[in-house]
């Protein structure tokens, strides 16, 4: 049930946001972003299953994503605009998606951020 009535059966927490005014060089650096996402997995206390990336054209943005046992972490970049979106979704009480999100924000050094939170849990009736 929405609103947390009853006991929580499945724990799911989603932290996501928009980062403005990031350094275009970092947003275009595939190796750096992969390293950041791998470290964010550790910070979240999640278990890395796979990591991947995709560059959109020779001078385009990047998508870097980690599939973790608990769900996923992703960064999508638009270097030409100094803009990135970050998505950290984890399941389980042992994970800390907010810490992973904050770590990524620290590494991308945006001038402005918007952050959003979603409860993706299931509650017993």
From Swiss-Prot:
The keyword Lyase applies. It comes from Pyrobaculum arsenaticum (strain DSM 13514 / JCM 11321 / PZ6). Catalyzes the decarboxylation of S-adenosylmethionine to S-adenosylmethioninamine (dcAdoMet), the propylamine donor required for the synthesis of the polyamines spermine and spermidine from the diamine putrescine. The gene is speH. The modification Pyruvic acid (Ser) is found at residue 71. Its EC number is 4.1.1.50. Pfam families: AdoMet_dc (PF02675). This is S-adenosylmethionine decarboxylase proenzyme. It is an enzyme of class 4 (lyase). One of its GO terms (cellular component) is cytosol. Pathway: Amine and polyamine biosynthesis; S-adenosylmethioninamine biosynthesis; S-adenosylmethioninamine from S-adenosyl-L-methionine: step 1/1.
């Amino acid at each position: 049930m929405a609103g947390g009535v009853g006991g929580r059966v499945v724990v799911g927490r989603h932290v996501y946001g928009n980062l403005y005014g990031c350094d275009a060089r970092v947003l275009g650096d595939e190796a750096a972003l992969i390293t950041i996402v791998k470290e964010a997995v550790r910070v979240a206390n999640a278990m890395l299953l796979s990591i991947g990336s995709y560059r959109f054209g020779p001078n385009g943005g990047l998508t870097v994503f980690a599939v973790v046992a608990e769900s996923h972490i992703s960064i999508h970049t638009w270097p030409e605009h100094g803009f990135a979106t970050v998505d950290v979704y984890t399941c389980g009480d042992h994970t800390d998606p907010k810490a992973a999100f904050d770590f990524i924000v620290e590494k991308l050094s945006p001038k402005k951020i918007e952050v959003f939170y979603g409860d993706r849990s299931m509650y017993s009736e």
